[in-house]
């Protein structure tokens, strides 16, 4: 069955409700996913908040979808590797998927727990996964958004700025951790606001909504050790993204 999985869900249940009925953004994502055709959700959480999360979020979702839980533990890395002393930051989205491999039995989507995507995004990704067989062509997909539609009047956001070709194929994603409205447009800074780089409003950006067939699991298992080999030598704060 098609599986949908929610990333970084650990403390989202503490977020402020967005309507008068006490719903949080994740409620809307699950509702939209169900409408699009997804049947199962796997929440990636921390062990220590498991009971609270199930009480505040999981039980509500169980009425509508098949719910499972997985745990992103930074110690869950390939044999022969050690977590750097003092590291508490998770290893990133790819590691979140690595942590729930046993729950994945078909094509699946990956989302952030606290971003709003809209029902059309779930329909697009579900339709793609439903019509593309798992083969050696890497039938993976990402839902992109126009940058101007993803910024806020209240501070800055982090977005993956995408490069695509004329066929709509993704060439690269460059993370910009501080993007905001600036001088009548949108710009990013990498030096705490000393200099700004303007970005066209219609630039395609990633909000970390991905669709994969099961073949990505073997790619993650094969690539994660290489990521650790390179990253641990250079920077103990690295994270492995999809």
Residue ranges and their predicted role:
Residues 1, 20-110, 117-124, 130-131:
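Conserved N-terminal catalytic core of the sugar/cofactor nucleotidyltransferase
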Residues 2-9, 13:
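Single conserved hydrophobic/aromatic residue that forms the stacking wall/gate
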Residues 12-15, 69, 173:
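Generic preference for hydrophobic
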Residues 48, 148, 214-215:
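Alpha-helix/helix-capping structural signal
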Residues 68-70, 110-112, 139-146:
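Short beta-strand segments
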Residues 119-209:
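Conserved core of the sugar-phosphate nucleotidyltransferase
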Residues 209-219:
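Conserved nucleotide-sugar donor-binding
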Residues 221-242:
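A C-terminal functional module that forms or caps the active site or interfaces directly
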